[in-house]
From Swiss-Prot:
Belongs to the peptidase A1 family. It comes from Arabidopsis thaliana (Mouse-ear cress). GO terms for biological process: pollen development; pollen germination; pollen tube growth; pollen tube guidance; protein catabolic process; proteolysis. GO terms for molecular function: aspartic-type endopeptidase activity. This is Aspartic proteinase 36.
Length: 482
């Protein structure tokens, strides 16, 4: 029997601080990246709302033919501070694997947000104040790649118009200017180094884009399109189009790397070609070896339906029938009385070790790649004696009615996930994300790269919420071969 409980707040939020180190032609660079929900006590409804807004964006009709798009108030889980222009000025942008451009709010913009609940200052980029700013015209190669419209003619600016699922819009022009990265010059020492990139300059935002609860200045996309930051760096010979992440939801810490990973070795599965997102083919699913029947459309190889890997989504979403079968098989192996919290989260009381009591869920992908999701991955503690399932009934379908699975940060944690756009594959391996990985630079030299708690003694209790400051190293490698 299912009963309803009053909404409860999650008692523990982990504040994650990322440090991004990039090695380009002449050295390494550093960014500080912060979790969107850092230091804030969030209701379950806020986590679900984050994903709901993101899903609307992912399934929306988009006027701009890019391999993805951006939404400043809900798109990603992490944001970073970058510098644009000359002299360089600071802007806070969200880091997202589901977006394909870097864009920031630009002056003048009467409807852009002027404040945010994230505790960061918001700024408008102004091309008039940068000595290195250049307009991007319709005749520019960058524009000809993304714009296939007769209205974009000679001597006209390369503009964009994005429409989101909730009716929000973003309009603006593309600009070419310097992004300033902090070059690592020694142990804990950096010096600025600028590199020219093309990014969107948003001047007219409407709808939810003006909301202030979690607004930032823009988006930095790590998607597959040639317009993404990683693709622009690769086109200039600075990096290979390979990146990976390893996020630890148990002990804290983790790694985000751009470049080749030598160890641990990961098995891979093909990325479905010509898709906006990181689509892969799910072939089977089981609970401790007990198979679950999959909807036929999930095995499609043409990109209709299937499974999307998206680290910017918080939870994991399944078609209704598949969700019901999964929860039924899990609770058959460990009987619990489910209660619905905030109408969508299946929760239960439990005082024993969940990893010993609950089964492992295995997802099997093309080319025999397995994703094992352990109880500590798919269950989260609402309070000391209450757990909730991170699996959600998504009801997500394509416009053609094909079922969609969306695997978010919850099931990708505690794994090294590698996105190899050079070979159009994605893969993963179970890994202790608080330890290290071995990465390879363009010369073939291998280096140990690990996550460490730079502020290990910074845990504190704020309004009953335990806030743990963590650090994550992120490395991007020079891809030249000798």
């Amino acid at each position: 029997m299912v009963t309803t409980m009053d909404p409860s707040r999650i008692s523990r939020i982990v504040a994650v601080v990322f440090v991004l180190v990039i090695q380009v032609v002449s050295g390494n660079f550093v960014f500080n990246v912060t979790h969107k929900f850092a230091g804030k006590e969030k209701q379950l409804s806020e986590l679900k709302s984050h994903d709901s807004f993101r899903h609307a964006r992912m399934l929306a009709n988009i006027d701009l033919p890019l391999g993805g798009d951006s939404r400043a108030d809900s798109i990603g889980l992490y944001f970073t501070k970058i510098k644009l222009g000359s002299p360089p000025k600071e802007y806070y942008v969200q880091v997202d694997t589901g977006s394909d451009i870097l864009w920031v709010n630009c002056a003048p913009c009467p409807k852009c947000p002027v404040k945010t609940d994230l505790g960061i200052p918001l700024s408008l980029y102004d091309s008039k104040t940068s000595s290195t700013s250049k307009n991007v015209g319709c005749e520019d190669d960058f524009c000809s790649f993304i714009m296939q419209s007769e209205t974009c003619g000679a001597k006209k600016p390369c503009s964009y118009h994005v429409v989101y699922g909730d009716g929000s819009t973003s309009d603006g022009d593309f600009i070419k200017d310097n992004i300033t990265l902090e070059q690592v010059t020694g142990n804990l020492r950096t010096a600025p180094l600028a590199q020219e990139v093309v990014f969107g300059c948003g001047k007219n935002q409407s709808g939810q884009l003006g909301q202030t609860d979690s607004a930032v200045d823009g988006i930095m996309g790590f998607g597959q399109s040639n317009t993404s930051i990683i693709s622009q760096l690769a086109a200039g010979g600075s990096t290979k189009r390979i990146f990976s992440h390893c996020l630890d939801n148990m002990n804290g810490g983790g790694i985000f790397a751009v470049g080749e990973v030598e160890s641990p070795v990961v098995k891979t599965t093909p990325i479905v070609p010509n898709q906006v997102h990181y689509n892969v083919i799910l072939k089977g699913m089981d609970v401790d070896g007990d198979p679950i029947d999959l909807p036929p459309s999930l095995a499609s190889t043409n990109g209709d339906g299937g499974t999307i890997i998206d680290s910017g989504t918080t939870l994991a979403y399944l078609p209704q029938n598949l969700y019901n079968s999964l929860i039924e098989k899990i609770t058959a192996k460990q009987q619990v009385k489910l209660h619905m919290v905030q109408e969508t989260f299946a929760c239960f009381s439990f005082t024993s070790n969940t990893d010993k009591a609950f089964p492992v869920v295995n997802l099997h992908f093309e080319d025999s790649l397995k994703l094992s999701v352990y109880p500590h991955d798919y269950l989260f503690s609402l309070r000391e004696d209450m757990y909730c399932f991170g699996w959600q009934s998504g009801g997500m379908t394509t416009q053609d009615g094909a079922d969609v699975i969306l695997l978010g940060d919850l099931v990708l944690s505690n794994k090294l996930v590698v996105y190899d756009l050079e070979n159009e594959v994605i893969g993963w391996a179970d890994h202790n994300c608080s330890s290290s990985i071995k990465v390879k630079d363009g010369s073939g030299a291998a280096y140990q790269l690990g996550a460490e708690n730079l502020i290990s003694a910074a845990s504190s209790v704020m309004n009953g919420t335990l806030v743990t400051l963590l650090s994550i190293l992120i490395w991007v490698f020079h891809s030249f071969t000798s």
